[in-house]
């Protein structure tokens, strides 16, 4: 079982943000640049695996998490590990996943003390433990979309100007190469957008599932005439002005005619 740590006050033993990041990156062979990137919860899960092998289901941890519901899933894995090892600490998941510096810094300060109280110095291969999975910094993924805006094409006409004896046909080749670069950039951008759409669909399904669970609870207690419950139902079923709910009973053939 784990040795619990209850002190969270600021002391001279607390590491600075830079020293904290250096410790995390060295221990887990990561490349974090900001404390806020700990909001994914993945690093904490791996630290628990280092301290107490088998205490967390490391295979369930999403090391490339980019969305809030994926962060929440990682923290659920961490919570299960805490419970298994008797760690008496409430994880403020709702605050941590927002990626705010202060909340994440306070939690990692506590976690560092918890780690020091429980680490026995045994060797640990973090890369092998996560099966070689590369980690992705939560707030450094989006800029990838901008990469296609820097094509190599403008550099090529300069080369053509330095060789006046080049046949006219070479100009067409340069334009073709520039077109190929532009096409490759567009394809890369499309692939990034597809991944973004997939992530958004997962997030949509996640929140829809929550709303569905709330709806079921309201239906189960429908006869209690609770004004709060009735207000929740009104909010769930409220629609924007002009919105028309599709007629689910309409024949399939009629829909196909349009």
Swiss-Prot record:
Gene3D superfamilies: 1.20.5.1430, Calponin-like domain. Residues 175-245 form the EB1 C-terminal domain. Its main location: cytoplasm. PROSITE patterns: CH, EB1_C. GO terms for cellular component: cell projection membrane; centrosome; ciliary basal body; cortical microtubule cytoskeleton; focal adhesion; Golgi apparatus; microtubule; microtubule plus-end. InterPro entries: CH_dom, CH_dom_sf, EB1_C, EB1_C_sf, MAPRE. One of its GO terms (molecular function) is microtubule plus-end binding. GO terms for biological process: attachment of mitotic spindle microtubules to kinetochore; cell division; cell migration; establishment of mitotic spindle orientation; microtubule bundle formation; microtubule polymerization; negative regulation of microtubule polymerization; non-motile cilium assembly. Residues 14-116 form the Calponin-homology (CH) domain. It comes from the Eukaryota. It is found in: Cytoplasm, Cytoskeleton; Cytoplasm, Cytoskeleton, Microtubule organizing center, Centrosome; Golgi apparatus; Cytoplasm, Cytoskeleton, Spindle. Keywords: Cell cycle, Cell division, Cytoplasm, Cytoskeleton, Golgi apparatus, Microtubule, Mitosis. Signal peptide: none annotated. Plus-end tracking protein (+TIP) that binds to the plus-end of microtubules and regulates the dynamics of the microtubule cytoskeleton. Promotes cytoplasmic microtubule nucleation and elongation. Involved in mitotic spindle positioning by stabilizing microtubules and promoting dynamic connection between astral microtubules and the cortex during mitotic chromosome segregation. Belongs to the MAPRE family. This is Microtubule-associated protein RP/EB family member 1. The gene is MAPRE1.
């Amino acid at each position: 079982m784990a040795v619990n740590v209850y002190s969270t006050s600021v002391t001279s033993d607390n590491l600075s943000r830079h020293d904290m990041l250096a410790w995390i990156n060295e221990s887990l062979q990561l490349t974090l640049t900001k404390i806020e990137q700990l909001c994914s919860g993945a690093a904490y899960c791996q630290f628990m695996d280092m301290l107490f092998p088998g205490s967390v289901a490391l295979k369930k941890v999403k090391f490339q998490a980019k969305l809030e519901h994926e962060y929440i899933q990682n923290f659920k894995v961490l919570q299960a590990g805490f419970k298994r090892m008797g760690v008496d600490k409430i994880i403020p998941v709702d605050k941590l996943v927002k990626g705010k510096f202060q909340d994440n810094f306070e939690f990692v300060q506590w976690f560092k003390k918890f780690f020091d109280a429980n680490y026995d110095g045994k060797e640990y291969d973090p890369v092998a433990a996560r099966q070689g999975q590369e980690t992705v910094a939560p707030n450094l993924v989006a800029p990838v979309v901008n990469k296609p805006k820097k094509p190599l094409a403008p550099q090529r006409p300069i080369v053509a100007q330095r060789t006046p004896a080049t046949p006219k046909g070479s100009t067409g080749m340069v334009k073709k190469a520039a077109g190929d670069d532009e096409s490759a950039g567009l394809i890369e951008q499309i692939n990034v957008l597809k991944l973004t759409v997939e992530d958004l669909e997962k997030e949509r399904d996640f929140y829809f599932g929550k709303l569905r669970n709330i709806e079921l609870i309201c239906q189960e207690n429908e006869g209690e005439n609770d004004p709060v419950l009735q207000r929740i139902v009104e909010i769930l079923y409220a629609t924007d002005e002009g919105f028309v709910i599709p007629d689910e009973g309409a024949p399939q053939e009629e829909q196909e005619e349009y």
